[in-house]
UniProtKB/Swiss-Prot annotation:
Binds 1 zinc ion per subunit. GO terms for cellular component: cytosol. NAD(+) binds at residues 132, 194, 217. Substrate binds at residues 243, 265, 268, 333, 366, 420, 425. Its EC number is 1.1.1.23. Catalyzes the sequential NAD-dependent oxidations of L-histidinol to L-histidinaldehyde and then to L-histidine. Pathway: Amino-acid biosynthesis; L-histidine biosynthesis; L-histidine from 5-phospho-alpha-D-ribose 1-diphosphate: step 9/9. It comes from Idiomarina loihiensis (strain ATCC BAA-735 / DSM 15497 / L2-TR). CDD domains: Histidinol_dh (cd06572). Belongs to the histidinol dehydrogenase family. This is Histidinol dehydrogenase.
Length: 442
């Protein structure tokens, strides 16, 4: 860590161009350059199916891969080896996540919009969904819970989980236990853009799903966006890429807590980004010292150090300026560590998930508070929402008009049809209103 330099900068001393640069995501330019590579992979999977996915799996993950689908026997054998303490932790997280998402069940509604005209809003669970669980250097059973629990509550009939295997063709036992707990029906040993293609287009061992969920690297995020824009019919949840955390802290903040939170996101990957906004130079200096000291003790120090190179410690004029910067940046995670944290909430709406107060670490939301940790990144929190139960449903409308009800609206409908020059639209109304009602009179 002696070579690491984490500068502290005064926001007001930066030019407009410099301010924009300080808030630029490190992985954004790379994501743009990946479009063509991802398109080639997806085209290969679409044309060649399972054979293409197996080839990519051998190239990037398990060189000896012969099949993609995990059997129930393989899952059971792996789960049997899992430590009971880990099972209890997963069970606890499952319960809190289930409780919070169960409370989100959407309710059908029915309303009479005009005499004799009934309109309804109804919800139906998605039939088949795909859950992408990132692999690489970390085991992520928590992501399986975040995706699997709402799919289970919604009642999705087929839930396909994909995750890249290790060199031995295995997935972590903790991940498999979480998947089993959530009722995942199929598990495929593949990752990257090719896994998204397998979910969206279907392969021999696993038919296509209707919607793909889950975070991932730039390849995965780009692949999700591409399949959702072509004619596959597959939807995506939200753009969820490299992790981000922005902390707003004042003099009441504990620098050790702030640094620990920043590092908890920096250790996710070298393309993660963390930002501190504080009106206090003293807080900024103390947080920097804590970052240096705590990072040196991490098992993933090298990864966190790379992320810190693109991270920012910014001293602002006051809390109003901190709020304005946060709203512009629209972070995936926002931590408010001030003496009036809850009072700031109404002004801080552009974030995937907000962590209020000194005793709400971001890692709590990652694992077990109950909120979902699949969140919009890259500034998409301005317009996208965090993942929730409703994302696993289709919403559709129903309308029913009696003969008298149609007559109530006939003039409005036929006039608008005339305005738009759509004669058949008008005729579909008048052919009914000009005939006698066949409705029974009880």
């Amino acid at each position: 860590m002696s070579e690491l330099r984490i500068p502290i900068e005064q926001w007001q001393s930066l030019s407009s161009a410099e301010q924009t640069q300080r808030l630029a995501r490190p992985g954004r330019a790379q994501a743009e350059s990946l479009r063509e590579k991802v398109a080639v992979i997806l085209s290969d999977v679409r044309d060649n199916g399972e054979r293409a996915v197996l080839n990519y799996t051998r190239q990037f993950d398990n060189p000896d891969a012969t099949s993609l689908r995990m059997s129930d026997e393989q899952v059971e054998a792996a789960v049997a080896s899992l430590d009971d303490k880990v099972k209890r932790a997963i069970d606890t997280a499952y319960q809190t996540i289930y409780r919070f998402h169960e409370a989100q069940r959407p309710q059908d509604l029915s309303i009479e919009t005009a005499p004799g005209v009934q309109c309804e809003l109804r919800y139906a669970p998605l039939d088949a969904v795909g859950l992408y669980i990132p692999g690489g250097s970390a085991t992520l059973p928590s992501t399986a819970l975040m995706l699997g629990v709402p799919a289970q509550i919604a009642g999705c009939q087929r839930v396909v989980m994909v995750s890249p295997p290790n060199k031995q063709g295995e997935l972590p036992a903790a991940l498999l236990y979480a998947a089993k707990r959530c009722g995942v029906t199929d598990i495929l040993l593949c990752g990257g853009a090719q896994a998204i293609g397998a979910l969206a287009y279907g392969i021999e061992s696993s038919p296509a799903v209707g919607k793909v969920f889950g975070p991932g690297n730039s390849f995965v995020t780009e692949a999700k966006q591409q399949v959702s824009q072509n004619d596959s019919g597959c939807a995506m949840d939200l753009p969820a890429g490299p992790s981000e955390l922005l902390v707003i802290a004042d003099d009441s903040a504990n620098p050790a807590y702030v640094a620990a939170d920043l590092l908890s996101q920096a250790e996710h990957g070298p393309d993660s980004q963390v930002i501190l906004l504080t009106p206090s130079m003293t807080v900024a200096e103390n947080v920097r010292q804590e970052l240096m000291a705590q990072c040196a003790q991490l098992s993933r120090a090298d990864i966190a150090e790379q992320a810190l190179q693109a991270s920012r410690l910014l001293v602002v004029a006051d809390m109003n300026e901190a709020i304005a910067i946060s709203e512009t940046y629209a972070p995936e995670h926002l931590s408010i560590q001030t003496d009036n944290a809850r009072d700031l909430l109404p002004q801080l709406t552009r974030a995937g998930s907000v962590f209020v107060g000194h005793y709400t670490p971001e890692s709590g939301g990652d694992y077990a508070t109950g909120t979902n940790h699949v969140l919009p990144t890259y500034g998409y929190a301005r317009n996208y929402s965090s993942l929730g139960l409703v994302d696993f449903y289709r919403r559709y409308t129903v309308q029913e008009a009696s003969h008298d009800g149609l007559r109530q609206l006939a003039e409005a409908i036929t006039t608008l049809a005339d305005v738009e020059g759509l004669d058949a639209h008008k005729r579909a109304v008048t052919i009914r209103t000009e005939t006698k009602s066949t409705e029974s009179k009880l």
